[in-house]
């Protein structure tokens, strides 16, 4: 029997939910969004996670469980509450200059939550794997450009094409080159301690 109460995929997604809830309760995002309903939906998702954590289901029964379906449905609802597709760009572009950096950080954490929830079913479909790395999404991308980090000689900043969108990532791999295929982990470094160590092990999205 698989112990779902210790499944990293479920634990990481629920932790991201808690962090997201704290952000949308306190952050001053500027834009046309339904803050009240987003908070309510994130709170209501807790019972789904609790039920899923102690379901001890396996295989298709776990992947296709009502709890997983409800979590994903609520995740999609939160995206709508935030403003739909492009909500992250709206919040960042509307942020005052003095709050831009903090807004980008908060948006990154909320996006991690959204990715964790909407991708939960696919990760659970991989089966009972007892490894923390399974709790995050990893996608393959192509490096489009590489530049040195302005504040750290041991880091590189890369523009990576994921197909549907391009992102900026930071890595300590000094041998990366344009045209390389790389694996990119989708998680905010603050969710893992110590963040510096984790960033040295994984490609980390920064925008």
Where are these regions (language model features)?
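Phosphate-backbone binding interfaces of nucleic-acid-interacting proteins
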Residues: 1-207
